[in-house]
Structure formats: C-alpha cells, structure tokens
Regions:
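Outer-membrane beta-barrel translocator domains and adjoining extracellular loop/strand segments
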Residues: 58, 100-102
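Extended lipid/amphipathic-ligand handling interfaces
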Residues: 1-10, 16-19, 25-38, 42-44, ...
Length: 174
C-alpha cells in the first residue's frame, strides 16, 4: 500500500493511493475534508480485480463468484452518509455455478444500499439484465435476473452440477 497526500489538517488531498486488492491494483484519488465535518470525494479505480478474493469475507457470496473485473467508482461521503456511482465490467464471470460473459453493471451507493440496476450480461447464448441490492450493514443481498434466448440445457447442466439427461430448447426466465 502506498499513499501520496498533501494539504492541511482541515483538508487532505489524496494525490494517489494504491494498494493490491484481490491480487490486483486498486487506486484512489480525491479530497478528504476533516472540518467542519468529515467529507470525502474519491475516484476509485481497479483493473483485473479478483472477484473470488473480494467476496471471500461475505458468507452469502464466499466461493460463489469467480473472475476478474474492472471497477470505476466515484464516492462522495459526509457525516450524514455516502453516495456514489460507477461501473463494474468483466469479460467473463462464474456466479453460483453459472457462466456469464460481457458483464456490465452500473453501480450506485446511497447510504448502506449498494445497488446495480439495469446491468447487462450474456448468459448461455442469450441476453440478461439484473437488478442487485446489497445491504452494507447486514451483508445481505438480493438479485433479480431476467433473461431471453438462453440455451436451457447448458444453463440447467451448470446450475445443477450436471443432469443425467438433456433439456432441449431455448428459454426466457425472470
């Protein structure tokens, strides 16, 4: 971890902050204002972040998400709460046994609610969109997924760990 800071006790400028997170570089820059009340405005960037390492500490997600992702997130925080927007993208991800491709998730933070609405991805030959909410206070999450044009057999095989038979056709799910 390395940090380059400048400024005064009232306002610190983060010229550059860098650390390894999940084996990949994560960087941040911005401003921390300490008086009259705490406020942070940070631009956070990460390339090639290991999703399995990053989700290891969350019981509901541990070992369930694998792949490398890129993160862009702009955070604004005050003593009244945090807000932010950004995106997470990945060429391929395995989530809960399912193989996803071309993942593009818009991100937002409002207090303890971390959300991804209208994310898109490719799923077994079809297209899918999602709406995810993660509560930072309780570490619980919910996700809804809508998909169309999906190869049902490939999805069923991966979702179940392998069926004894074969499912034919294409499907839509929500």
């Amino acid at each position: 971890m390395a940090a380059d800071l400048s400024g005064s006790p009232q306002a610190l400028k983060v010229n550059n902050f860098s650390a390894k997170v999940g084996g990949a570089p994560l960087s941040a820059s911005g401003t921390l204002r300490l008086t009259p009340s705490m406020r942070a405005d940070l631009a956070i960037r990460g390339d090639g972040l290991d999703l399995e390492a990053l989700t290891e500490g969350f019981p509901d997600l541990k070992g369930q998400i694998k792949g490398k992702a890129n993160l862009v997130f702009d955070l604004s925080g005050t003593d009244k709460g945090n807000t932010g927007t950004g995106s997470l993208s990945a060429p391929s991800v395995e989530a809960f046994g399912l193989r996803l491709a071309n993942v593009k998730l818009p991100l937002s933070l409002d207090g303890n609610a971390f959300k991804s609405s209208n994310g898109t991805l490719e799923l077994y030959g079809g297209k899918a969109s999602n709406s995810l909410t993660f509560d930072l206070k309780t570490f619980k999450f919910s996700d809804s997924l809508t998909a169309s044009g999906v190869d049902v057999n490939a999805l069923a095989q991966d979702a179940t760990g392998g069926l004894g038979g074969k499912v034919t056709g294409q499907g839509s799910l929500s």
